């Protein structure tokens, strides 16, 4: 109670929302309002992340034309090659992209903390908590997603083992620099080494994918889709229009991408082109570009129309009035977010890069708002920001990961998209999500104060790392046993799938409870 009373005297608790008399409200009411606003921010974060994923998919599917001449026939041969390597796309763009809400939040927290010798607690707490949420609840959801009796396993076990090794090493490394080398202090070179290890992860994963001798694990690769976006499970009945603009041309999302991308992925391979076709193609290409521009603007305009529509064509066909009312109410709640994110250009333009960058800007803006609201919740309730970070913030920022992995586990023919992304994201959380903010703070302190960066709550963070390491070992052990005994990481007999899911959730509860008790000084 003493902490709650003290919260009223802290200047940062005076006001934040845009109405008068906020400070006159009871503490409980203010905490409820801030929590509701925080939840609304998470809804917006989930919405923009959906567009973010689609833009990444467009980027990673981009192919380029390589024109060669057949030495025997002198015919022009056009070859379409993927720009992105399958594994590098997973580690570089997908893992980084799915972790960007957490990375953005941690970086903003570090920038706000410039000028102080002590690091903020929101960033590291959120990233460690997010790693736990990714590993336990997301695995718990994915393992029960395949249909009863069906099994889905990782196709390239070697790459997964490499990524798993770097994921475990990331948390061992973090514990070493926090408790062994320079206890409770982060130096400039430690922060720099943390960031550089992300490059080593990329190199090692690529070496494993290419089966380089001496540095790769000699494991055979299973059947893997040719595209970065894996083939979809034909046994699953679903709506292709789950993305934000699915109602533009129902059931034709793939056709939209093929038409409006400068390089169609459906025509990969080789084909001969006569000289006459090459000469005559310039006029046709000009007309095609004009036609594409018109349709791009048409699609962009349709995004605003969809954002302003409270009842979709699907909900109109529902027989239940109650469900229709619920759907309209929900669309009314998220309408401001939908209208705001309609300004993000369609992901078909420039292979998705413009939508990718715009989505990053929106995610960063929401992350900044989340940090401010979290400060207010901590201030008015007296709850440690670190506790809020690895519980509410971690779950909220990882929610898009859960949705994406759930869809992948349900729709894809392999478990790579669902499981491998989790281990990659956890590595990125440390090497980039914690490394970059610490690098920013340590560089500032080194050049301005000639001082290192002090970690105020190093003991609590180190304890959380130990608990996470122990529980994650239990999680990975069960996944390996499922691979050996059942033949796949996901699916299988429903009883064992649900038993595994419950076990993973218990591990997450153990992590949250023990970490909270340590931060609160109970243990």
From Swiss-Prot:
The lineage of its organism: Eukaryota, Viridiplantae, Streptophyta, Embryophyta, Tracheophyta. Belongs to the Ca(2+):cation antiporter (CaCA) (TC 2.A.19) family. MHX subfamily. InterPro entries: CaCA, NaCa_Exmemb, NCX_ion-bd_dom_sf. GO terms for cellular component: membrane; vacuolar membrane. Gene3D superfamilies: NCX, central ion-binding region. Vacuolar transporter that exchanges protons with Mg(2+), Zn(2+) and Fe(2+) ions. May control the partitioning of Mg(2+) and Zn(2+) between plant organs. It is found in: Vacuole membrane. It is a multi-pass membrane protein. Keywords: Ion transport, Membrane, Transmembrane, Transmembrane helix, Transport, Vacuole. The chain crosses the membrane at residues 24-44, 88-108, 125-145, 157-177, 185-205, 325-345, 349-369, 377-397, 428-448, 461-481, 495-515. This is Magnesium/proton exchanger 1. One of its GO terms (biological process) is transmembrane transport. It comes from the Eukaryota.
């Amino acid at each position: 109670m003493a902490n709650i009373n003290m919260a009223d005297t802290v200047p940062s608790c005076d006001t934040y929302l845009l109405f008068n008399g906020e400070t006159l409200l009871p503490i409980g009411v203010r905490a409820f309002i801030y929590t509701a606003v925080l939840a609304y921010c998470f809804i917006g974060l989930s919405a923009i992340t959906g567009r973010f994923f689609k833009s990444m998919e467009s980027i990673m599917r981009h192919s380029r034309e390589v024109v060669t001449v057949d030495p025997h026939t002198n015919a022009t041969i056009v070859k379409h090659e993927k720009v992105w390597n399958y594994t590098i796309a997973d580690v570089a763009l997908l893992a980084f992209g799915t972790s960007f809400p957490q990375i953005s939040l941690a970086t903003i927290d570090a920038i706000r903390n410039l000028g102080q010798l002590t690091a903020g607690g929101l960033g590291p707490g959120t990233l460690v908590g997010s790693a736990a949420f990714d590993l336990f609840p997301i695995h718990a959801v994915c393992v029960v997603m395949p249909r009863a009796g069906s099994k889905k396993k990782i196709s390239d076990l070697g790459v997964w083992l490499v990524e798993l090794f770097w994921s475990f090493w990331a948390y061992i490394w973090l514990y070493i620099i926090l408790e062994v080398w320079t206890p409770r202090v982060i130096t400039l070179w430690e922060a720099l080494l943390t960031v550089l290890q992300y490059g080593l992860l990329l190199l090692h994963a690529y070496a494993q994918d290419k089966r380089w001798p001496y540095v790769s694990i000699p494991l055979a690769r299973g059947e893997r889709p040719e595209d970065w976006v894996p083939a979809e499970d034909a046994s699953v009945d679903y709506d292709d229009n789950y993305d934000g603009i699915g109602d533009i041309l129902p059931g034709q999302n793939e056709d939209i991408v093929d038409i409006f991308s400068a390089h169609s992925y459906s025509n990969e391979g080789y084909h001969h082109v006569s000289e006459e076709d090459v000469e005559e193609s310039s006029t046709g290409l000009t007309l095609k570009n004009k036609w594409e521009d018109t349709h791009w603007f048409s699609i962009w305009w349709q995004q605003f129309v969809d954002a302003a529509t409270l009842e979709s064509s699907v909900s109109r066909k529902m027989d239940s009035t109650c469900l229709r009312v619920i759907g309209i109410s929900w669309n009314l709640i998220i309408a401001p977010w939908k209208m705001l994110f309609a300004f993000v250009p369609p992901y078909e333009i420039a292979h998705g890069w413009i939508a990718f960058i715009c989505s990053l800007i929106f995610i960063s803006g929401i992350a900044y708002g989340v940090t401010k609201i979290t400060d207010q919740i901590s201030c008015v309730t007296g709850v440690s920001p670190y506790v809020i970070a690895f519980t509410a913030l971690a779950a909220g920022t990882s929610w898009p990961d859960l949705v994406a992995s759930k869809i992948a586990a349900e729709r894809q023919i392999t478990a790579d998209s669902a499981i491998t992304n989790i281990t990659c994201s956890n590595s990125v959380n440390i090497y980039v999500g914690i490394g970059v903010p610490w690098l920013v703070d340590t560089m500032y302190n080194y050049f301005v104060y000639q001082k290192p960066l002090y970690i105020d709550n190093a003991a609590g963070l180190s304890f959380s790392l130990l608990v996470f390491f122990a529980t994650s070992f239990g999680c990975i052990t069960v996944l390996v046993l499922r691979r050996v005994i059942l033949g796949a990481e996901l699916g299988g007999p429903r009883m064992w799938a649900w038993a595994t899911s419950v076990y993973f959730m218990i591990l997450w509860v153990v992590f949250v409870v023990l970490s909270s008790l340590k931060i609160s000084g109970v243990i």
